[in-house]
Amino acid sequence: MPMKPIGKLIAVILITTFAFSACKKPLEYPLIPSIDFKNIVGVKDANGKDQYLQVTIGFTDGDGDIGYFSPESGLNDPMFDYPADATNPYYTNFKVKTYHLINNVWTVDTVDLSARIPYLTPLGSNKALKGEIQRELPIDVGLVNDTFYYEIFIYDRSLHQSNTVKTSNIVINS
């Protein structure tokens, strides 16, 4: 029995789809992570006061060695876990520097908002990663119409430092 025209069309679409997906090249990115600023928004409570900021960055990494396991797991290189304080530059791998506008002068804030990115390496032979990271940045209670911006970079497990991105300015009302 001959195939109907619609059946032929579906067969051609399926064969073409499988042929192109089989030929798809794996993602390739440089081994040094690269980031780009996506956005920063204030998350408000029911009274319209900022509770925290949510910043989003995009990233790529060619070998996918982004993020750490929890320190309690014992699966990280010890250099990423100990000491778990400011003397260890690699304890956190999502680095944030805060700038506060005070009397029309941008001043570096001493509060460290850096954090740990969780382990993100994919399974399989192609480890290249592309994605977004969202991070909540706490804000001080009582700030009214204060202006900030942030500089952010990340480290991968090979200690490659990404480029640094600057967020847009944001006015906080907490």
Task: List each model region and its residues.
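Polar low-complexity intrinsically disordered regions
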Residues: 1-2, 147
